[in-house]
Amino acid sequence: MFEEVQVLIVGAGAAGIAAACRLLEQGLENVTVFEAGDRIGGRVHTVEFADNVIELGAEYVHGERGNISHELASRHNLLEGSKILTKNENWIFADSQGEIIPREQSTELLNIYHGIYAVMPNKLTDFEGSFGEYFTQEYFKAFKENPFTNFTRAEEFLEWIRRYECIIDSCDSWSEVCASGLAEYWICPGNPLLNWKGRGYKTLFEVLMNKFTPEANELPLLEKVHFKKVVSSIDYSSENQIIIKTTDNLERNADHVIFTPSLGVLKEQHNNLFTPPLSELKKRTIQGLGFGTVDKIIFEFPYKWWPEDVAGFNVVWSKEDKTKFLQSLDKGNEWLAEVFHFSTVDHQPRVLSGWLTGPCAKHVENLADSIVLDGFYDILQRFFSKNFNIPKPINMIRSKWNQDKNFRGSYSLRTLESKKLDVWAKDLAEPIINPTGKPVISLLYRYHLIVISKNETNHFLQILLFGGEATNEHYYSTVHGAVESGIREADRLIDYYRKRKSQL
């Protein structure tokens, strides 16, 4: 059925790997993967560090039911819930005078936060403004009913939540996040913080390759991947085959192309990448959907200086102290006032992970490692040294997702601009017609950009599919959303050829 079918997959991230493995599993052997970098995984990036491995990209499997990553991993008992991260009472908050905030206050704050989230899906759909407006409104409603601290401290806590939400949504500001657009996102029920028992998220790809399934043959995925192949053009104007060119002057023809690079790459390159160009509607969709930067800065300490029951550390500025602090800084160091959160890392007893997002993260990507390490350490000292003897980190590793031309950011979001432009995932279902009147491009509802060119002689379709987390209506920004997209697009090809064979 598949002997002469040529499929080229652009990108060896979660979507590309999932698509390739599905096709190989079903007997389509003529699969080629062009990967611009020197590794598989994309925004899943597991590296050795300190006593084990850490994740520079995706870290946890979020939820169980409806989560394809959980479904795949649980067959082999590869996941476990975090021991302490999900317990609100295990998070320490300190104010800008270096005093630990009473745990009953910080615990109640997190209870309110999660309480707002629990009922949020039913309230967001008809909210006209930003998610920042929505959450602020709901937060002060909850505070009025339960004044768990004084009003000034409540405002300071809200500022901490704002920064935390910018990490969750990968946004520069929660004022740009569309509340009604956020309603599209589906939360998978079950434990939201499942780790890989010290193996790292890269284990998911081993599962996809059947390495944990003794009764199945291991799929030869890595034999199909060509590294450092940067695609420079995809020409689908011909009625015969799609022509793909790379920056090192390699040219390859294919019957089908599955395009899986990030929305950040699309934003930067789509005008020069596709022939013919994408329609104005598709361009507006790429423009309207957001794609932000979230970076991790991970520190190794010579020993564990925090108690066993501590999940992480959070900093809460007063307006007055923050103003004075900013005035004391040299120009270019304002980013220090945006450091707010350090979390422990499962299976890494001497490691803390700091987070930055938005313009601040992009700025810090350009700073020297020594400046970043010293800056984070100074914040830890300022807020927590009254209560803990904090040694200086002995090692640091960090992500630079915006700086990397193969990603240009971390993950996607729904913005107010997308609402203003009236562009949503459903627009991916609308066809684009070429000058001859034949349907050459259509976008699959909920998932992927598909380019279809009919071959009158051979009576089969050439299809260019866009996969990846940003193409998923309900599970965008997640690995399981990316994996699902790759599998569904592979299944689209498989289903087509099965139907075609049945008609012969």
Feature-to-residue mapping (PLM):
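FAD-dinucleotide binding site
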Residues: 1-504
